[in-house]
Amino acid sequence: MKTISTRAAVFTSPAVDVVGKAFEEVSASFERFCLAAGIEALSAVMEKDAEEACGPRHCRSADRRGYRWGRTSGKIGFHGGKIDVERPRVRARGGKELALPSWEQAVAEDWLGAWAMNQMLLNVSTRKFKRSMRLPQGDVPAAAGAALSKSAASRQFVALSAERLKEWMASDLSGPDILVVQIDGIHISEHLVLVAAIGIDGKGEKHPLALLEGATENSAVVQALIDNLIERGLDPAAPRLFVIDGSKALSKAIRRSFGSHTPIQRCQVHKARNITERLPKALHATVRRALRQAWELDDADKAEKLIRNLAKRLEREAPGVAASILEGIDEILTVTRLGLPNELRRSLACTNIIENMMGTIRRVCRNVKRWRSPAMALRWTAAAMLEANKGFRRLKAHKQLAALRIALKAHYEKNSSNRDLAHKAKAA
């Protein structure tokens, strides 16, 4: 079978001949037919741009902006690599080159960069990029400069992922009605930890919000994360629930920025895991059952009493663990104290959204053998979070979020009135 070349010579022939030749092989290579037809259409648009600047050929109009200056070839990246496309050159009366709008737009689209990024997110190794190109003849040796080498693919991914990370970390947050913010640490490697934030709006839709290098125990890191959210439009005065992994530094930073009355829910999954890891294996089932029973109660006072009784029972066998159970007990039962429905409590009592997202992050980062720098980890993880966002589903209990909004409003009004009474008493 004769292979259609994508060099400039193909596209200098008349449009009918090019499309006709491509159509002859459409049954064997429909992708090449589309590519040939698309490039010919681009060539026609560039000719039109040249005519608008110079007028019709052999016409010396007085109001023309420039004149033709031969032809040249340039490279445009597609999903199958870079190809040579011939284009007309136009110069202004002063001799300066005039850009063709259609050519500038085609180059700026960066189809090849977007294709390379999708390939990386699908775990295609850079060594296999040539074979994974969408044109059927993916195993045909690529011409020099086709940008299909592993180094070129890596450069394209680095550039585009860095650009996406920058755009994402500067995106406006004043639009979404964020009711819940979950913040948790993501362990990329033994010595590399990132802090991620995900929001849930009033309709139950999930939004990746931010990502920073560092641990949740680092007060400077968590404060920088929160400052970034506020600078991008997250209203610190709006009633909102925070779900965190249990870090004291994170709790302090939230209350410092959003107010001392801000409701914070500690992740119950993290809490149970931290407790059982310090206990003998024989006690694991008993302790988990007691904690689950407490968390499923609708009465926060009864739930707290049950947890305190559990701590008393463990004082003899594991006194250190007993103290750990009582640590942060108010924040463990926040969703219960707010009076939320049981199904909504289960959804908001832990940071499982971030935990579940780790599956996508591990899949996307599976081919990374060595993390060269924190910047590399940020780029890859941000790309994975945005990839995971495509598959996010609404919160299961999204119909009950109206109850959360009412409970948060009542909580804020109650604490506001208490502060006013305290100020009056102090003034008296």
Where are these regions (language model features)?
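RNase H-like nuclease fold core
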Residues: T3-R7, V19, H58-C59, R68-R71, ...
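Amphipathic alpha-helical transducer elements in NTP-driven molecular machines
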Residues: I39, S43, E47, T126, ...
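Metal-dependent DNA phosphodiester-chemistry modules and their immediately adjacent helices/loops
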Residues: V85, I275-K305, N309
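Acidic/histidine-rich catalytic cores and adjacent linkers
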Residues: K2-S5, P14-E25, C34-A37, S43, ...
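Short, amphipathic alpha-helical "recognition" segments used to contact nucleic acids or chromatin
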Residues: W111-N123
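Short, charged amphipathic recognition helices of the HTH superfamily
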Residues: L122-L135
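Inter-helix linker motif
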Residues: S260-E277
